[in-house]
Amino acid sequence: MTQESTMNDIYPLAALLIYATNQKVTKEKISSVFKFLGLESHPKICEFFEVDAVEIKKLLMSSTQEAAAPAGPQEPAEASGDAGKKEEVEEEEIEIDFGMF
């Protein structure tokens, strides 16, 4: 991994760390986490990760929710009112002579 990609991975982790301590996630707090770690932070990138606690909770919960089951095919209702009657199609059996016997 390059140093730049490692740095970009720290921003969301810093935001989650601040959220986990029940504090409001601000760019100042993110930059203070970087200062504590002895790293340089960019204020513009810190602004991208400045998120409300409700939004962070939505993000965390959306990744753990189960996907909705797909809806099954719906049969159209019969307009004639003969719901109890079904037309039976008779299949004809055709004998095929292959001339073997």
UniProtKB/Swiss-Prot annotation:
Residues 65-101 are annotated as: Disordered. It comes from the Eukaryota. Residues 89-101 have a biased composition (Acidic residues). Residues 65-79 have a biased composition (Low complexity). This is Uncharacterized protein ECU10_1070. It comes from Encephalitozoon cuniculi (strain GB-M1) (Microsporidian parasite).
